[in-house]
Amino acid sequence: GVILTGSHVIDGAKDIDVTTYNGKVYKASVLAIMGKNKDLALLKITPKQHLKTIPFGNSELVKVGQKVLAIGNPFGFTGTLTSGIVSRIDYTKGRIQTDAAINPGCSGGPLLNSKGEVIGISQSIYNPDKNISNIGIGLAIPINEAKKFIQSANLSSNLK
């Protein structure tokens, strides 16, 4: 299985473990990294059985006000699902802004539309006070940027 996540999530790690939705833990290897500016990474795990996948959406169709869901592991609370809306689309920096709670431990996880399609990869929160609490400004990398990354890594035939 190939896992898409944020490169800062694995930055500096000697060993990388991926835990799936059912609690199984797999050793992962890095297939490709797209630097800190884009903050994307592809990991490879070797499960004994087929993994469920989440379909990619089209981030060009994302609209301000649309409902979104973020999945992550904030502060170690595994499998957390939060909801919100798209607050803004920053075309200059290439980010989707949302008020869905994205806290430490959520980055690298999917931002989903109401159809359950991945429209972004949760990246960070904006917090001018420099504490680690979410103030309602979460940022995600649009999935179309990730699709370009996957194509450039010549792995698109292995992914859905």
Residues of each region from the PLM?
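Short proline/glycine- and basic residue-enriched helix-capping loop/turn segments at helix->loop/beta transitions
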Residues: 85-86, 91
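Conserved hydrophobic positions within beta-strands
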Residues: 28-31, 86, 111
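Soluble non-cytosolic domains of exported or imported proteins
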Residues: 56-63, 76, 80, 106, ...
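C-terminal cap/linker of serine protease catalytic domains
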Residues: 13, 51, 118-160
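Short, Lys/Arg- and Gly-enriched loop/turn segments at beta-strand edges
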Residues: 76-84, 130-131
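Conserved active-site neighborhood of the chymotrypsin/trypsin-like protease fold
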Residues: 1-72, 76-79, 93-97, 156-159
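Catalytic nucleophile loop of clan PA
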Residues: 101-122
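Extracytoplasmic/secreted envelope proteins and their assembly/folding machinery
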Residues: 7, 40, 62, 68, ...
